[in-house]
Swiss-Prot record:
One of the primary rRNA binding proteins, it binds directly near the 3'-end of the 23S rRNA, where it nucleates assembly of the 50S subunit. Keywords: Methylation, Ribonucleoprotein, Ribosomal protein, RNA-binding, rRNA-binding. It comes from Aliivibrio salmonicida (strain LFI1238) (Vibrio salmonicida (strain LFI1238)). One of its GO terms (cellular component) is cytosolic large ribosomal subunit. This is Large ribosomal subunit protein uL3. It comes from the Bacteria.
Length: 209
């Protein structure tokens, strides 16, 4: 099943009737408008392209303006694609709302994680620190050995070392939907989701539910 594109508003908490506090992330899921339907015959695969939100007219390029005009939808802040399974049918200009999650209990949320800049191995990869004393006076937060000797004589690709952390696409799976507020286009999801406040997130039905 397809998902929806939303915007992370922030975190809060709600209480159950028993008085239990549940931390939730509020995701504003504005109406997603179908801007293109892709088929096996024309594109080699089945998918729909959606947009949401709005964009200033002077920020819309001519190719984008023509694309949105052809679909008959308002220019949005971006374009996203969802692959279609056999039997799913949509029309250009159709609108998808948060109500499609009324019968769904668990979702996967994809976003761009917060950028942390250049970080060391301890923060980036959760390495343990070395001794603070006992003869160690220089290498408290150093990673330690990064390889072997003349054989192989190099550092293997993928070695966990210091470097740029965050600002990459990631997915948090199997998050519980606590509430669907169709009137205000809000989705309350238990726990944290990737990204900063105001960032775009993609909410899909959980694949492992």
């Amino acid at each position: 099943m397809i998902g929806l594109v939303g915007r992370k508003v922030g975190m809060t908490r709600i209480f159950t009737e028993e008085g239990v506090s549940i931390p939730v992330t509020v995701v504003e899921v504005e109406v997603n408008r179908v801007s293109q339907v892709k088929t096996v015959e024309t594109d080699g695969y089945n998918a729909i392209q959606v947009t949401c939100g709005s964009k200033k007219a002077n920020r819309v390029s001519k190719p984008e303006a023509g694309h949105f005009a052809k679909a008959g939808v308002e220019a949005g802040r971006g374009l996203w694609e969802f692959r279609l399974e056999n039997g799913e049918e949509f029309t250009v200009g159709a609108e998808l709302s948060v109500e499609i999650f009324n019968e769904i209990k668990k979702v996967d949320v994809t976003g761009t994680s917060k950028g942390k800049g250049f970080q060391g191995a301890i923060k980036r990869w959760n390495f343990a620190t070395q001794d603070m004393t006992h003869g160690n006076s220089l290498s408290h937060r150093a990673p330690g050995s990064i390889g072997q000797c003349q054989t192989p004589g190099r550092v293997f690709k993928g070695k966990k070392m210091a470097g740029h952390m965050g600002a990459e696409r990631c997915t948090t799976q199997n998050l519980e939907i606590v509430r669907v507020d169709a009137e205000r286009n809000l989705l309350l999801i238990k726990g944290a989701v990737p990204g900063s406040t105001g960032g775009n997130v993609i909410v899909k039905p959980a694949v492992k539910a």
